[in-house]
Every structure is written in C-alpha cells, then in structure tokens.
C-alpha cells in the first residue's frame, strides 16, 4: 500500500497560529446564577481571576478596562473607580483609559466626578487635544458657556496649535460675541503670525464687520507681516499674497487708485515678484486703459527677461527677445544692452557650437542696428574689425557670413578694393567654401574673368575632391565659350596623374565632358572618351551597354557632312537665321546600329576571353533587348539563338556543397563543330591521296 504523505506545515500556518495566540483574550464563562449567594460567589471568583491575571501582566491596560467594566456591570461604581485609579497609576498617559473613565462617570450621571477627572486629565496631559475637546464638549452640552470660555482661555494660554484658536473663535461666533472674537484674533495673530491667520480674521471682518474694520485689519496685517519678513524670509510670499488680496478687495470697493497704488508700491519693494507683476497686469486688464495695459505688459516682459538673464547670461534666445523688446519700446537702452551681451556673454568654447552661432547672430543684429538704425558708419566698420580680429578665433574656426557681411558693407560704402582685401584675408586665414563661392560670384558679376579663374584654381587647390566646384568651373568656362579650357579642366581629374581622384569621381567628370563634346559636335573626340569610360568602370556589363547606346547616338562622318550642307543651304535661304539656332538632327541609320552592334560584339569577345560567363550572358541579353528595340525580327532571333543554356549543378569544394551554374554558349559549340568538320575533311583527303599512291 502507498503511504499517504503527511500534511506539510508552511510558514504561513506558523504565523497564523502565533497571531491567534497573541489575540486570545481572557474569557469569562457564562454561568447561570440562581440566588444571591451564587452571585457573590461568582463575583468573588471573577475578581480573583482578574486580580490573578493582572498580577501576572499588570501592563495589560485593556484587561484593566475590562475589569472596570465588569464592576460597572455589577453596579459597584466604588470598585470600578478604584480599578480605574489603579490602572492610571500604571498607565497615566494612556488617553483611551482616561476617556473610558470619564464616559463611565457621565453615563451614570456623575457629572462632578467626570469634571474632576477631566480637570486631572488636562492637568496631567495638557498637550493632549482630545482631553481638552472632551471637557469642552461636556461643558458646552451642559450650557456652561462661562466655563467653556474659561477653559478656552486656559488652553490658549499654553499657545496651542491653530485649530484650537479656530475652535475658540467659532465658539464665540456661535455666542455672537464679536468683540470677544476680535480680542481672540488680536492674540491669535501674535502666536501664529502667518498669512493664513490674518486671512481668517479678514474673512471674519468681511462677514461680520464693516469696510472700515476690514481695511483696518488689512493694514495691521500688512504692517505686521512686513515687519516679520525683515527677519523671516519665508514670510515674504505671505506679504505679497496679502497685498494682492488687499488690492483686489480695494478694487471691489471701487477704490481703484488705492488698489493700483498698493501694487505699485509693493513692486518697488519686490521688483522681481511675478505674483505682483501678474496682479498689476490683471488689474490693468480689468480696470485700466488700453495704453496702460500695454505698458504694463511690456514692463512685465522686460522684467521677466532681465530676471532670466541675471541667472543665465548665456541664454542667447532670451537676449534676442530682450533686445527686440528694447528696440521697439526703450530705444535709449538698446546700446547699453548690446554692450552688456557682447562683452559678458562671449562663449568660452574653442569649437564652433550652437552658442557661438547664437552669439554671432547677436553681433549681426548689432552691426545692422549700427548701420541702418543709427547710421553710425565709422563705428560699424570699427566693430566689424573688432569682431574679426579680437572675438572670432580664426585659428580654430571662422564664420563666412561675417566676412561676407563685412565685404558687402564696404561695397555699400563704394570701397570695392577693401571688400576684395577682406575676402582675400578670409581665404588666407581660414578658407571656406561659402567665402569662395561668394567671391567668385562677386567677380563674375563684375566680369573680372581672370580673377574668377584664379579663384577657381585656388578653390580647387583648397578642396580638390568637391565635384560641384569642378562642375561650376566647367560651366563657367562653357559660358565664356572656351572649349579648350572646358576640355582641359575636365581632363585633369580624368588623367589623374597624381592618383588623387577616385574612379567614380573621374566617371562623373567624364560624363560631363562627353555631354559637352556632343554639344560642341566634336564627334571624333567622343570615341576615346567612351572607351575610357568603360575602362574606368572596370568593364562592367552596364558600362559596355551604355557605350553601345551612346555609340548609337553618335553620327557618322556622312551624317555630319550632310548636316553641314543642309545648314549652309538654310543660312543662304534666310539671312536673319543665326547659325546657333540650327540644331544638329539626324535619323538613326543602319550604320549607327552597326556601330552599336560592333560594341556589343567586342564586349562579348572580351567576356569570352576572360571567361566571365555570367557577364557574357548578361551582355547577350542586353544585345537581345537592343535588337528588339532597333533591329528586326530576324536580327533579334539571330541573337536570341546565341543565348546560353543554363545548367544548375552542385560542386563539392573541400567537403562543402555549393550550387554551381554552368553556361553553354551555342557560339562555342558551333566553332567546335566547324573545327571537327575541317579535321575530318583533311583526313578524308589524306586517305584518298594514300590510296592513289598505292595504285
């Protein structure tokens, strides 16, 4: 038989047992009592049990309370009082014991006994609010209002918490003794001088007092809090909140001058207070004119910006907003503000980060202000020099925009040579693409083409791998109609004598040169360029295909001659016709197609020789596509017959099986068949000659 496993005891079971044993109470068995002697016997036994338990554990206050309740149930109040007194000697600070003692006396109607116990309780435990409130509730329920008042006065002499004073004032309000309430508040604010206390007094006066008393309390509160705030900074916010409320109250009384004056005087004392500034702004919105409202808003914004800048001197966004505000509303302060930011907020980093960019933006705003707003040209030029030589660390980085703005400034002053000198200095100290482009554009507009060529040459020395610069240089020479220089500029990277340029870079310029040669109608120069293009492309299928398609668009010598004859005839017929207006046009003939086919054949031979079967198959497919577009059905079918058959196999290399694709070209098989036929024919001819000799 299989044994039934015993139930496992978990930690939760152990904790439950401990909890039950701790909460197990001393129980009293229910006994049926038939006569007085049995009652006395039961009482004696129960008292013995209680006494025995308390001897063992005299600190169990709840058991003392059960003992006292038992005696009360036996209608023996004398014994119950004795037990309560014994318990108090053990735990005099246990408040529930006092409360149970007091409530027991009250339930049985022993008011004087309860009052005596309450007196003892508040004397022994004067800081326990519950005992005081119990005493007050008892006396007020008995309508002993004088005793209640005396108790409150006695309690308040101990300088208790704010809720005690609030209870005292609420009691006097219920008795409608408003002067006594004012006397209480006059002492209350001395003990708790914070704004919340004064607000309670003010609310009382608003409800039960007059305008005069409300204003008087506001004034007292303001004087007191300001005096306290001199030594206690935490009361400053209370003062400000009180002033705002005082101002609102005065506005409700339609005393607008008083209301605004309060805020303005307070702002003079605490100019950085957002609460006061917002309150003044709100006052102007509700009671001011459009002009005063706008002035207040602007003033608040100005103070707000100044507060931020005092803490964050490198907050350039705020500086820009602040300067814009001053320009529009306080023009006399603008120069001082510019001086402050430009001298105090110079970035400390030696890298061109966002702080430098924002700082330079402020300089640009300053220089624009000097030139256009106050028209101080000498000072503007002086500040440009200061910025360039003393502020910007040109050894580490520079700002092309500043050099360009300086040059434009001198151009506006008709100092062209100085502008050139400035741009030249910029390129000498710290050359930048933006500066080169601007200088080139300037000289181009001035039609100083020799200077432009020099600048382009220096630009390419500075940044020779910038394709856009080479393209721009070529376009510039093309705009002047100088074919030789266009070709020379393009050939520098293409020839790549110093090995600086990558093949992709050379291919880009080669494309540009081919397009220009086509435009100039120098068709004889295109063939070597196309071959060079294929070579630089590592003889890829795409390069050969592109070569063939471009070869298709290159006219033959006959087509060029026909075009020249046609052009001469048209020029004779129309004297007003310009030679450049006649575009070169020709139809694609079989000769053009044969030229393209020749390229495809060369590509096939090339891939066959180097045994690149996959590329050979791809160029054949391109050849088929070409014939499909430009050839006829027979030419297309002829090329399609040359397409290879593909056989997929598996090759074992060092134990690893990989897929192997084999291409079989019909061209190769035909050649093999031709070679075999020739050998057989020769053998047959040799045999016949031998037979003839033997005869």
UniProtKB/Swiss-Prot annotation:
Q: Name one GO biological process term.
A: cis assembly of pre-catalytic spliceosome
From the UniProt record, list the HAT repeat ranges.
41-73, 75-107, 109-141, 143-174, 176-207, 296-328, 333-365, 375-412, 414-445, 447-479, 521-553, 591-629
Q: Could you cite one Gene Ontology molecular function of this protein?
A: DNA replication origin binding
Signal peptide from the UniProt entry: none
Chief location bin: nucleus
> Which residues are in coiled coils?
none
Q: Nucleus as a keyword? A: yes
Subcellular location(s): the record lists:
Nucleus
| Any single Gene Ontology cellular-component annotation | U2-type post-mRNA release spliceosomal complex
Cite the SMART domains for this sequence: HAT
| One Pfam family, short name | HAT_Syf1_CNRKL1_N
Q: What does this protein do?
A: Involved in pre-mRNA splicing and cell cycle progression. Required for the spliceosome assembly and initiation of the DNA replication.
Family classification = Belongs to the crooked-neck family.
Q: Whom does it interact with, and what assembly results?
A: Associated with the spliceosome.
Q: What is this protein called?
A: Pre-mRNA-splicing factor CLF1
The species this protein belongs to is Candida glabrata (strain ATCC 2001 / BCRC 20586 / JCM 3761 / NBRC 0622 / NRRL Y-65 / CBS 138) (Yeast)
């Amino acid at each position: 038989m299989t044994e039934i496993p015993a139930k496992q005891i978990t930690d939760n079971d152990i904790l439950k047992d401990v909890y039950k044993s701790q909460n197990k109470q001393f129980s009293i068995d229910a006994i049926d009592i038939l006569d007085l002697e049995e009652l006395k016997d039961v009482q004696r036994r129960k008292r013995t049990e209680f006494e025995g338990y308390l001897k063992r554990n005299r600190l169990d206050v709840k058991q003392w309370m059960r003992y006292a309740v038992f005696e009360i149930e036996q209608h023996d109040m004398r014994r119950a009082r004795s037990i309560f007194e014994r318990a108090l000697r053990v735990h005099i600070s246990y408040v529930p014991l006092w409360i149970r003692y007091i409530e027991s006396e009250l339930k049985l109607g022993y008011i004087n006994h309860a009052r005596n116990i309450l007196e003892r309780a508040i004397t022994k435990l004067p800081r326990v609010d519950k005992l005081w409130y119990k005493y007050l509730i008892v006396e007020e329920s008995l309508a002993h209002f004088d005793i209640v008042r005396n108790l409150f006065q006695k309690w308040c002499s101990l300088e208790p918490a704010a809720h005690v004073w609030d209870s005292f004032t609420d009691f006097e309000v219920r008795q409608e003794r408003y002067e006594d309430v004012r006397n209480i508040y006059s002492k209350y604010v001395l003990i708790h001088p914070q704004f919340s206390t004064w607000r309670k007094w003010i609310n009382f006066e608003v409800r039960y007092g007059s305008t005069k008393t409300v204003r008087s309390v506001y004034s007292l509160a303001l004087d007191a809090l300001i005096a306290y705030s001199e030594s206690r900074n935490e009361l400053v916010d209370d003062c400000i909140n009180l002033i705002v409320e005082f101002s609102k109250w005065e506005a409700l009384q339609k005393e607008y001058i008083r209301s605004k004056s309060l805020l303005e005087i307070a702002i003079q004392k605490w100019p950085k207070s957002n609460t006061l500034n917002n309150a003044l702004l709100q006052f102007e919105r509700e009671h001011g004119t459009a002009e005063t409202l706008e002035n207040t808003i602007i003033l608040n914004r100005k103070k707000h910006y100044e507060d931020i800048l005092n803490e964050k001197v490198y907050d350039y966004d705020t500086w820009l907003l602040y300067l814009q505000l001053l320009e529009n509303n306080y023009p006399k302060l603008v120069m001082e503000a510019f001086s402050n930011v430009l001298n105090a907020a110079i970035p400390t980093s030696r890298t061109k980060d966002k702080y430098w960019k924002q700082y330079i933006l402020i300089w640009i705003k300053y220089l624009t202000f000097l030139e256009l707003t106050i028209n101080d040209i000498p000072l503007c030029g002086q500040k440009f020099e200061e910025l360039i030589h003393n502020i910007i660390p040109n050894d580490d980085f520079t700002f092309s925009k500043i050099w360009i703005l300086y040059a434009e400034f001198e151009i506006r002053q008709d100092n062209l040579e100085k502008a050139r000198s400035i741009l030249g200095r910029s390129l000498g100290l710290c050359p930048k693409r933006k500066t080169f482009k601007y200088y080139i554009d300037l000289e181009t507009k001035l039609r100083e083409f020799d200077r432009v060529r020099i600048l382009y040459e220096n630009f390419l020395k500075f940044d020779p791998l910038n394709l856009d610069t080479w393209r721009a240089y070529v376009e510039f020479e093309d705009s002047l109609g100088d074919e030789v220089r266009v070709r020379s500029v393009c050939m520098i990277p293409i020839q790549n004598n110093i090995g600086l340029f990558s093949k992709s870079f050379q291919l880009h310029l080669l494309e540009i040169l081919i397009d220009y040669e086509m435009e100039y109608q120098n068709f004889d120069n295109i063939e070597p360029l196309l071959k060079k293009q294929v070579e630089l492309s590592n003889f890829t299928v795409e390069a050969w295909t592109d070569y063939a398609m471009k070869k298709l668009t290159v006219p033959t010598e006959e087509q060029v001659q026909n075009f020249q004859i046609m052009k001469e005839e048209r020029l004779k017929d129309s004297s007003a016709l310009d030679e450049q207006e006649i575009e070169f046009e020709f139809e694609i003939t079989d000769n053009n197609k044969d030229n393209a086919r020749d390229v495809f054949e060369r590509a096939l031979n090339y891939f066959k020789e180097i045994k690149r079967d996959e590329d050979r198959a791809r160029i054949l497919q391109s050849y088929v596509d070409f014939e499909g577009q430009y050839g006829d059905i027979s030419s297309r079918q002829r090329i399609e017959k040359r397409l290879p058959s593909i056989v997929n196999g598996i090759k074992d290399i060092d134990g690893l099986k990989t897929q192997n694709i084999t291409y079989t070209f019909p061209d190769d098989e035909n050649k093999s068949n031709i070679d075999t036929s020739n050998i057989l024919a020769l053998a047959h001819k040799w045999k016949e000659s031998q037979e003839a000799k033997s005869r």
